[in-house]
Amino acid sequence: MFSGSIPALVTPFRDGAFDEKAFRRLVDWQIENGSSALVPCGTTGEASTLSNAEHHRVIEVCVEQAAGRVPVIAGCGSNDTMNALLHMNFSKKCGAQAALCVAPYYNRPSQAGIIAHFSYLAEHNDLPIVLYNVPGRTVTDILPETVCELAKRYPDKIIGIKDASGDLSRVTDHRMGIGKHFCQLSGDDELALPANAAGAVGCISVTANVAPRLCADFQAACAANDLEKARELNDKLYPLHYAMFEDASPGPVKYALSRVFADINEDLRLPMVPCNEAARKAVDAALVHAGLLELA
């Protein structure tokens, strides 16, 4: 089971190309600062702007650089089931420990279609699957009854969920419908504390890109049932959680990384553009609040 602070890693670019050297340094920095697993090629990693060859190279580099120190949950989502399987096949071959598979987006399948999609993936690859529910982006909601059906149908294949629905009742729905063994990970940093209280065991995090040690310590406090410490760390991180979405993501998180980690610049791929001035001010203020930046 995966648990703790799991960054949804940014994909660094330089002059329009994947900056492999910066990414390797980011992987090392994350592991050195307590991240318990890594997710390349998720939403924050701008996976939708990567060619398949680039997508696979990012996963491959992440697995190589992690070198078994922490597990890699490879972003394998697609609204084309065969393309999702292609990503899973590559990820399995290169040594990833699991696949993060988002609900098919844009084509808006029914719940029956969602079940068919994930069933096909589970039946045609041995890589464990973490479902990813983010209806605000996909316009498709993996309903609790669908999650429960999939988890019961494929108990060794569909092992968990990253839920970014914003609905905290889902954690209890899944826990009661499937059991404690089902790995529930928050997909919303600002809801990680109440999600953990309800039965989640960690967070696939945007903020952890920038504040890996604080996020890891926060998750450790939750796991130890040290509510006072968890609240203290959550309060430190709270403004940063919201600053990461002050403008279209991942613009703010790349700006924040450029402030605290010299190897990462703000380069994004169109249609994403660098964050606006208001977002920069919010990020700077949040970094100061978290003790990660001193302004002159």
UniProtKB/Swiss-Prot annotation:
Domain of life of the native organism: Bacteria
Keyword Nucleotidyltransferase belongs to the record: no
CDD domains assigned to the protein according to its UniProt record, in alphabetical order: DHDPS
Pathway note: Amino-acid biosynthesis; L-lysine biosynthesis via DAP pathway; (S)-tetrahydrodipicolinate from L-aspartate: step 3/4
Keyword Glycoprotein in annotation: no
GO cellular component: cytosol
Record site feature (Part of a proton relay during catalysis), residues: 43, 106
Sorted UniProt keywords: Amino-acid biosynthesis, Cytoplasm, Diaminopimelate biosynthesis, Lyase, Lysine biosynthesis, Schiff base
UniProt-listed InterPro entries: Aldolase_TIM, DapA, DapA-like, Schiff_base-form_aldolases_CS
SMART domains: DHDPS (SM01130)
Reactions it catalyzes: L-aspartate 4-semialdehyde + pyruvate = (2S,4S)-4-hydroxy-2,3,4,5-tetrahydrodipicolinate + H2O + H(+)
Entry binding sites for pyruvate: 44, 204
Active-site annotation: 132 (proton donor/acceptor), 162 (schiff-base intermediate with substrate)
Coiled-coil ranges (or none): none
GO MF entry, a single one: 4-hydroxy-tetrahydrodipicolinate synthase activity
GO biological process, one term: diaminopimelate biosynthetic process
Subcellular location: Cytoplasm
Enzyme nomenclature, EC number: 4.3.3.7
Subunit structure comment from the entry: Homotetramer; dimer of dimers.
Role played: Catalyzes the condensation of (S)-aspartate-beta-semialdehyde [(S)-ASA] and pyruvate to 4-hydroxy-tetrahydrodipicolinate (HTPA).
Family classification: Belongs to the DapA family.
Protein name stated in the entry: 4-hydroxy-tetrahydrodipicolinate synthase
Organism taxonomic ancestry: Bacteria, Pseudomonadati, Pseudomonadota, Alphaproteobacteria, Sphingomonadales
